[in-house]
Amino acid sequence: NITLPTPPQPVANYVNGVRAGNLIFLAGKGPKYPDGRELTGKLGGNITIDQGYEGARQTAINQLSVLKEMLGDLNKVKRIVKVLGLVNSSPNFIDQPKVVNGFSDLMVDVFGEKGKHARAAIGVNSLPRGQAVEIELVVEVYD
């Protein structure tokens, strides 16, 4: 079982999610832990693939908490449609997919077949507050 934290609040002028019809677009979230810690740094630098994977997994938990707050019940999720994973990477780091698997694997663990999604895993030079990852997603929900 996964304990969902209080959803992390936006850090700038945006909202956690927007519903358009039966789609929910969730803003990017990072690996913020319930105790307030964040996983910061660069993959291929001071962060290992395993640490990045765990950070992406925590990001998935944070996004699930946003979804639950918006929907009231995760059983209203019809499917995870699209995931965009941004990985704070050193110039030669090429294993972004292995990191973002921490997010994807949890979505499949929670939702089964309907957790399988289209995805991009992209290396970037920096992320807000030095986060190791930032991940956004699109979710289809029942009426």
PLM features: residue spans?
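Short, polar/acidic, helix-capping and beta-turn segments at strand->helix junctions
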Residues: 2-143
